[in-house]
Structure formats: C-alpha cells, structure tokens
C-alpha cells in the first residue's frame, strides 16, 4: 500500500500558534455514506487562524446542515457558533464567546456561563485529528440544543478500512457524551481525517462512513 504523507502533521513553524494552525489543511472535502446509504458531505476550510466546518446530510423529506466556525488558538479549535439547520430553517443554534454560551432550539434560547472548551461533535472530530486523539481540557459538547459533559475518551483499537479502491488502517475512539456514546475513527496515512463518526441525537442515529477524500483540492487515496 502506498502511504500518503499525513497532511495534518507535516508542517513546522516558528511559533506555537502558527504551527498548530498550519497543521490543518486549507480545505478538505469528505464524502460519507450515512445510515441506509444516505449521502453526506463534510467540508473544512481555513483562512489564517479562522476555520469553518459544514456537514450536509440528506434524510428523507429534507436536508440537514450542521455548521460551525471559529478560531484556531494553539492546538485548539475554538468555536464561536454552531447551527443545526433543517429544511433551510435554523432548528437550533449555539453562540459562544466571552465565557458564555447562548444555546437552544429557535425561540427557546438560554444563556449560561462556561469555562474550559466547548465544541460540537464535528469540530471535535477535527480537534482529535490534529491533536492525535487528545481531548482539550475541560471539554463540554453542544449540539445547539443542549450542553453535555464529556465523561472521557477511550482508544478502541485499530482496524483495516476500505476506501476509494484501497485499504488503510484506522484508529478508533469512543467518547462518552452525557449518557450517550460517540464513536470516531481516523486514518493516519490519509491525513488523519475522520473516517467514521457515529452518534445518536434526538432519537436519530447518524453513522457516517468515509468514501472519498479531497485535501486542498486534490483527491487522496490509500
């Protein structure tokens, strides 16, 4: 198998801030197959120390768009917002800044003080990728509707994964979010991008399996 040099871990810089920001790609487009074969796309874009993550999932009758954005500080992605948009309308949203978070379904927002780091599940996927499976200190998770404590992250072994006509090794992790479990997997030889994201929210199970990768506009294969 031809190993593709990881794009997330290849650049060095003089300062910690620029080094950590440079380890993320300028852009990434990840195509997934979801539950029942439903297509999903996640894009990551970076401009300087700002980032944006957009995940589009097509479900029966409507589409879901999860969007978050913020800044890169050291080795941490710091969201300033997260939106859950369904059928073109904002279903839930979180706004973060100044040690506070305003979150909730549309028309049901509330504000709380927060400390440590608060991320959504898609931002956390890239956080774990760039930080080699390590959680930021004091992490909480938001899905726009609620705020969850994280009860730990455990390595869950490695496996062979088929993608784009080849195979590669993935490293698996299990995260406890409140009373539910989130499963992640990453492919070190393919830029350590998220290859699997599986979780349940509002009674719906999302099981995303990576099918193709573009990093900085170029297709990446095993």
What are the language-model segments listed below?
Residues 1, 20-22:
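Absolute protein N-terminus
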Residues 1-8:
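Bacterial N-terminal signal peptides that target proteins for export
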Residues 14-18:
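N-terminal signal peptide c-region/cleavage motif recognized by signal peptidases
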Residues 22-98, 133-222:
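Acidic, serine/threonine-rich low-complexity disordered tracts
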Residues 26, 124-125:
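Long, intrinsically disordered, low-complexity accessory segments associated with secretion
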Residues 102-124:
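Acidic/charged, solvent-exposed loop-and-adjacent secondary-structure segments enriched in E/D, K/R, S/T
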Residues 126-132:
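Beta-strand/loop-rich accessory regions of lumenal/periplasmic or secreted enzymes
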């Amino acid at each position: 198998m031809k190993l593709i040099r990881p794009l997330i871990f290849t650049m060095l810089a003089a300062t910690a801030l620029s080094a950590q920001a440079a380890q993320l790609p300028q852009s990434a487009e990840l195509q997934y197959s979801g539950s029942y074969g439903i297509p999903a796309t996640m894009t990551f874009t970076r401009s300087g120390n700002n980032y944006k993550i957009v995940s589009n999932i097509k479900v029966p009758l409507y589409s879901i768009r999860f969007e978050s954005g913020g800044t890169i500080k050291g080795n941490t992605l710091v969201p300033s917002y997260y939106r859950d948009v369904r059928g073109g309308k904002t279903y839930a949203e979180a706004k973060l800044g100044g040690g506070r978070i305003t979150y909730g379904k549309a028309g049901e927002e509330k504000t709380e003080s927060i400390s440590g780091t608060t991320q959504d599940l898609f931002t956390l996927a890239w956080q774990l990728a760039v930080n080699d499976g390590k959680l930021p200190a004091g992490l909480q998770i938001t899905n726009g509707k609620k705020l969850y404590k994280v009860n730990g992250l455990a390595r869950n072994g490695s496996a062979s994964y088929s993608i784009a006509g080849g195979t590669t090794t993935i490293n698996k992790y299990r995260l406890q979010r409140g009373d539910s479990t989130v499963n992640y997997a990453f492919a070190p030889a393919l830029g350590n991008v998220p290859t699997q994201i599986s979780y349940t929210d509002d009674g719906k199970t999302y099981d995303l399996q990576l099918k193709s990768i573009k990093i900085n506009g170029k297709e990446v294969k095993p």
